[in-house]
Regions:
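Mid-domain alpha/beta scaffold segments of enzyme catalytic cores
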Residues: 1-39, 102, 165
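Short, surface-exposed amphipathic charged segments that create phosphate/polyanion-binding patches used
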Residues: 11-15, 96, 119-120, 171-173
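C-terminal active-site rim and adjoining tail of enzyme catalytic domains
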Residues: 131-135, 139
Length: 173
């Protein structure tokens, strides 16, 4: 939380060394601090020195621009764009196409026919991940979106297993 930088740093230092923690999540809507705010820039700098993965919750007109800035400024960090920017999927896919450290996940209560296929066609399967928002949303709903997107078994395996394993740094990937 950018409003509580010292406390956030203390939490990162406490939890990130543990093997079951792989990164941090930023939800600027909850904190009320825009991703473009200088306080968020300070938080991101603190994260960059401690983590390898950041999940940024979608929301707000500043998100695409700040994602591009973060991706350029911190190329060693992997960024997961929560909900693939919601209804701005095309913009999210273009960002993921341009920045190899940006990844999309599509968990949401909005099925948006064709959004996963359209994103894949723009940025490639390597930039897509499975996200479920469990236990807020039944994972079967989200998995159904992937299963009904006309993807091959190899593409589904990449999204469900290979890409997350690589991005999360699991099993030495």
């Amino acid at each position: 939380n950018a409003n509580f930088l010292p406390e956030s740093i203390a939490e990162m230092e406490r939890y990130l060394p543990l093997p079951n923690f792989v990164g941090v999540k930023i939800h600027s809507s909850y904190s009320g601090v825009s991703n473009a705010d200088p306080k968020m820039q300070e938080l991101m700098a603190a994260i960059a020195g401690r983590a390898r993965l950041v999940k940024i919750h979608s929301g707000g007109p500043d998100v695409p621009g700040t994602l591009a800035r973060f991706a350029e400024q911190y190329p060693h960090l992997n960024f997961i764009i929560a909900h693939a920017l919601g209804s701005a999927v095309t913009e999210a896919a273009r960002l993921a196409q341009r920045y190899p450290n940006l990844y999309l996940e599509f968990c949401s209560s909005w099925a948006g026919a064709g959004k996963i296929r359209a994103a894949l066609d723009l940025c490639g399967v390597e930039q897509l991940l499975l996200g479920t928002d469990m236990d807020l949303i039944d994972p079967a709903f989200v998995i159904g979106q992937y299963e009904n997107s006309g993807l091959s078994e190899a593409q589904l395996r990449a999204i469900y297993w290979d890409n997350p394993r690589r991005v999360l740094g699991l099993d030495g990937a």
